[in-house]
Amino acid sequence: MKRLFLLRHAKAQPADGGCEDFDRTLMLSGMQDAAAMAHYLRKNEYACEQILCSSSARTTQTAELVLQELESEIDYRENLYLADAAKILAAVRGAPGHVSSLMVVGHNPGLEATAALLAREPVRRKERARHEALEEKFPTCALAILDFDVGRWRDIVQGGGKLVDFVRPKDL
């Protein structure tokens, strides 16, 4: 089994003429949300072996706050900056086979599209509720967790993942 965590960066400073989009840092509320999400992961005993992270300032800060609660290796990747679902999926499929749990820290709309692409049709009521929340909005610092019944990351297919959790900062 492979477990995929898709974490959108936390709330960042507004885009204004002051700095490049890539260099935008987290707002205080974003830092608090990321710390709360990290605590949620630890409290629920979610383990993540490796993190693939967009190299932007806001994703880097989000990942570092999550690392305060998780023991993971982190790999910063420029090609995940504003990546679409195809690029994210390619990165996931290229993950080492020995890694059973992988997190991608990135941006919308790519993360939301990736979650929607990979999640299977809901089977149970709780799973349906998670799908409805995901379809409503994938806000900053939201986390989707998908399980795949495969032995290799490269075998992940569209609609092949069970959406086992979808958490937003307002849920914490």
Q: Where are the regions that the model predicts?
A:
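Short phosphate-binding loop-to-helix
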Residues: L80-G97
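Domain-level recognition of soluble alpha/beta enzyme cores
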Residues: A119-V164
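A generic local structural motif
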Residues: M37-L41, L89-V92, R130-E132, V150-G151
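Generic beta-sheet signal
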Residues: L4, G97-G106
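Active-site-proximal alpha-helix that buttresses catalytic centers in soluble enzyme cores
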Residues: K2-N79, A83, L111, L117-R125, ...
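Conserved histidine-centered catalytic loops in small-molecule metabolism enzymes
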Residues: C48-L67, I74, D147-L172
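Glycine-rich phosphate-binding loop signature in dinucleotide/nucleotide-binding domains
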Residues: N44-Y46, G94-S100
